[in-house]
Amino acid sequence: MASTLAMTPVATERTITRKSRTPEPSPGFAGPGHTAVEVLAARARQTDPFVLLMDDRLDFDPGQVLGGEHPHAGLETVTLMLEGGLDGEAEGLLQTGDLEWMTAGKGVIHGENVRAMGRTRLLQLWIALPRALRHMEPQVELIHLASVPVRREPGAEVRVYSGRSGDLI
């Protein structure tokens, strides 16, 4: 997805202003069976363009419908499936290692009929779009694990979902 947006890299120098420990999981918005950890809290001045990073843990019966319709606008959500999966009629099937990159742009309503595939864990990062791109048409890209390039080095394996690592783009 990042390759479809014409964005100029911007170097921003930052200093560490505070350190914190990641909190314990707390009840999530989807009710019993959902816990979440706010890994990166919304502190726009310190974390811009990153709005929020959540570590969501879902323990629902397979096929159970989750959440419901909800809107996003002016941002991108990047969802990495760490364990399990979700099956969304509109979004498609996300399984372990898959990534969904949704650019909400001028606005999108999504999340209807998303079904759990049993125990699931995912990371979701919210990124503020630059002002010039906040009113673009919404788009969604699913990146399935099998299509993600892998860079192997002694003692390390890097999957490149966006950007580059060494010679991999």
Which residues does each PLM region occupy?
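A short glycine-rich, His/Asp/Glu-containing loop-to-beta-strand
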Residues: 26-79, 146-169
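"Short basic amphipathic alpha-helical interaction patches in structured regions
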Residues: 91-98, 114-116, 139-142
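A short beta-strand-loop-beta hairpin characteristic of the jelly-roll/cupin
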Residues: 76-96, 105, 109
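Short, structured patches in soluble enzyme cores that scaffold and shape functional sites
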Residues: 124-131, 144, 160-164
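Hydrophobic alpha-helical membrane-insertion signals
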Residues: 2-37
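Ligand-binding loop in jelly-roll beta-barrel domains
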Residues: 105-133
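Short, conserved beta-strand element in jelly-roll/cupin
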Residues: 70-86, 126-131
